[in-house]
């Protein structure tokens, strides 16, 4: 399979090949048969770029559904060293309705946490301030999943949502999680962890002040659990601020 996939990738710029329905069918079957393992494979990166391109430029729902099921199983086998970013961003946006049932089942399953670990930074916010692909589509699928699986989905979603809307307030997603599931300690812990995952260059004091401003804005939240959590976060940030100021002065 790998030598054949290598041949296809070497000719990936010959888009006219995929205009032949028979060739296109063979290529897609080859993609679905491609072995994804823990072993580093030099083809993995090019494979991911090629598959992403096919998904973006095509409209084959059956292929997208089959690919989603394949990746759920393959990504769950162990930590993958290959870079497969790009594929799931397209799947959860363009083919959302097609893949959702299988995706949702895997997302909330403890047996498929390896799969979630592999994709969460790509389709979530990761270490950036942006909005991940999972949250770029304006529908109720993620919210409904959280309500359907309140013991599993919210704490996982909380790790992936965008934290800030602007320089002064938390994002709508962040506020929704607090409003709906702020009575769950696991969810609050996940939100706390999410606030601490940013990649930041230079002094972190501006980031700490940004967090403090957002937290001060929800000190009077209707949930007592959230109010207590806010106080805990503020105390922690104030300690971080003092430590950082002392370090910079030194």
Residue locations for each model-derived region?
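Non-catalytic all-alpha helical scaffold/repeat segments
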Residues: 1-250
């Amino acid at each position: 399979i790998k030598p054949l996939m290598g041949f296809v990738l070497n000719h990936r710029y010959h888009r006219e090949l995929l205009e032949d329905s028979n060739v296109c069918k063979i290529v897609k079957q080859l993609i679905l048969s491609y072995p994804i393992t823990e072993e580093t494979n030099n083809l993995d990166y090019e494979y991911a770029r090629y598959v992403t391109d096919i998904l973006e430029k095509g409209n084959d729902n059956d292929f997208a559904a089959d690919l989603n099921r394949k990746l759920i199983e393959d990504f769950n086998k162990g930590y993958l060293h290959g870079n497969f970013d790009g594929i799931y961003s397209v799947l959860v946006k363009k083919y959302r309705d097609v893949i959702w049932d299988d995706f949702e089942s895997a997302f909330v399953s403890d047996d498929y946490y390896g799969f979630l670990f592999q994709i969460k930074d790509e389709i979530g916010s990761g270490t950036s301030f942006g909005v991940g692909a999972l949250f770029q589509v304006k529908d109720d699928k993620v919210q409904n999943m959280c309500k359907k699986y309140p013991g599993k989905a919210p704490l996982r979603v909380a790790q992936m949502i965008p934290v800030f809307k602007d320089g002064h307030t938390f994002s709508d997603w962040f506020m929704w999680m607090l409003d709906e599931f702020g009575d769950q300690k696991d969810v609050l812990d996940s939100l706390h962890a999410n606030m601490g995952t940013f990649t930041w260059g230079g002094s972190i004091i501006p980031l700490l002040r940004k967090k403090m401003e957002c937290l001060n804005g929800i000190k009077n939240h209707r949930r007592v659990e959230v109010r207590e959590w806010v106080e805990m976060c503020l105390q922690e940030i104030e300690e971080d601020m003092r430590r950082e100021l002392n370090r910079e002065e030194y």
